[in-house]
């Protein structure tokens, strides 16, 4: 099978679920923007990042 015919199923399903997870994505992006100038390194958006990927994972598993 030629390589151009190979489709990464994981990526396909994740991409198809991203529109259903817009709210957590926007929350993550807003957090990243908010802490962009933090020089201390103590602020992070880990919670928002995991909330977004939890939404995508939940959608993919259905």
From Swiss-Prot:
Biological process, per Gene Ontology: mitochondrial electron transport, ubiquinol to cytochrome c
Keyword check for Ubl conjugation: no
InterPro entries, per database record: Cyt_b-c1_6, Ubol_cytC_Rdtase_hinge_dom, Ubol_cytC_Rdtase_hinge_dom_sf
Annotated keywords: Disulfide bond, Electron transport, Membrane, Mitochondrion, Mitochondrion inner membrane, Respiratory chain, Transport
Keyword Membrane on entry: yes
Cellular localization per UniProt: Mitochondrion inner membrane
Main location: mitochondrion
Signal peptide (UniProt feature, chain positions): none
Disulfide links within the chain: 17-59, 31-45
GO CC annotation terms, alphabetical: mitochondrial inner membrane; mitochondrion
General function of this protein: Component of the ubiquinol-cytochrome c oxidoreductase, a multisubunit transmembrane complex that is part of the mitochondrial electron transport chain which drives oxidative phosphorylation.
Protein name: Cytochrome b-c1 complex subunit 6-2, mitochondrial
């Amino acid at each position: 099978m030629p390589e151009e015919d190979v489709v990464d199923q994981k990526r396909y399903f994740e991409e198809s679920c991203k529109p259903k997870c817009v709210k957590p994505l926007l929350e993550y992006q807003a957090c990243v923007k908010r802490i962009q100038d933090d020089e201390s390194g103590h602020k992070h958006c880990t919670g928002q990042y995991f909330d977004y990927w939890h939404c995508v994972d939940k959608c993919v598993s259905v």
